[in-house]
């Protein structure tokens, strides 16, 4: 369960980081109308309730596209859809801080657009990409609703396991979760000092 959740978090975060970064760079270098449209479309998963996102992903992938829910495809797609807008939102401010003349200078000096992208733009926005990746991992580990609607029946993420364990009368698990919560709370307080 823990290994599967971590693998899901890092895998979906990697895909979300690629999609979010690509979308942010593409929107940044697009015309204003396209940029504004992409920005508005990016906000839909952010302001939408996770329950609606999870249910919609389940309906779209399982019912419309006919992908079996026993695979991990709906779960991974749900986590990517949930996380990619946050990566986009982390990368866009770094693009606005960047000096656009450096990219143009690289092109004037004979660099191909792809070479200039990887050698000029990506290093300047690397901190935004990294923060977006960390946010995507955190969202994936924390998510309950999207995982509930899209996960296979035989798989539990950490969040679904914890919520399901606290619903029943499993007092040993509840006690262990309370102890774990106390330890995490103390660690957070110590780190903040």
Predicted regions and their residues:
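C-terminal transmembrane helix and the adjacent membrane-cytosol boundary/short C-terminal tail
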Residues: 92-103, 107, 113-120, 175-193
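Transmembrane-helix boundary motif in ABC transporter permease subunits
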Residues: 10-42, 59-63, 117, 193
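Membrane-interfacial helix termini and adjacent extracytoplasmic/periplasmic loops
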Residues: 34-36, 51-82, 114, 150-154
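Interhelical loop and adjacent transmembrane-helix boundary motif
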Residues: 1, 141-193
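Hydrophobic alpha-helical transmembrane segments of multipass integral membrane proteins
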Residues: 3, 7-19, 23, 49, ...
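Alpha-helical transmembrane segments of multi-pass integral membrane proteins
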Residues: 8-16, 24-27, 42, 46, ...
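Hydrophobic alpha-helical elements at and bordering transmembrane segments
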Residues: 1-2, 6, 27, 38-44, ...
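Transmembrane alpha-helices
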Residues: 88-91, 98-100, 113-142
């Amino acid at each position: 369960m823990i290994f599967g959740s971590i693998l899901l978090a890092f895998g979906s975060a990697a895909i979300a980081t690629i999609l979010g970064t690509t979308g942010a760079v593409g929107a940044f270098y697009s015309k204003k109308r396209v940029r504004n449209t992409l920005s508005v479309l990016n906000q839909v998963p952010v302001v939408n309730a996770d329950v609606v996102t999870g249910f919609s992903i389940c309906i779209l992938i399982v019912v419309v596209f006919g992908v079996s829910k026993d695979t991990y495809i709906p779960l991974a797609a749900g986590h990517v859809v949930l996380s990619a807008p946050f990566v986009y939102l982390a990368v866009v401010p770094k693009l606005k801080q960047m000096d656009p003349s450096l990219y143009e200078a690289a092109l004037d000096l004979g660099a191909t657009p792809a070479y200039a992208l990887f050698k000029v733009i990506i290093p300047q926005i690397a901190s935004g990409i990294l923060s977006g990746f960390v946010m995507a991992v955190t969202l994936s580990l924390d998510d309950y609703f999207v995982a509930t609607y899209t996960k296979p029946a035989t798989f539990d993420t950490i969040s679904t396991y914890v919520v399901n364990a606290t619903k029943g009368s499993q007092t040993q698990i509840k006690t262990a979760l309370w102890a774990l919560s106390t330890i995490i709370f103390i660690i957070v307080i110590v780190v903040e000092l």
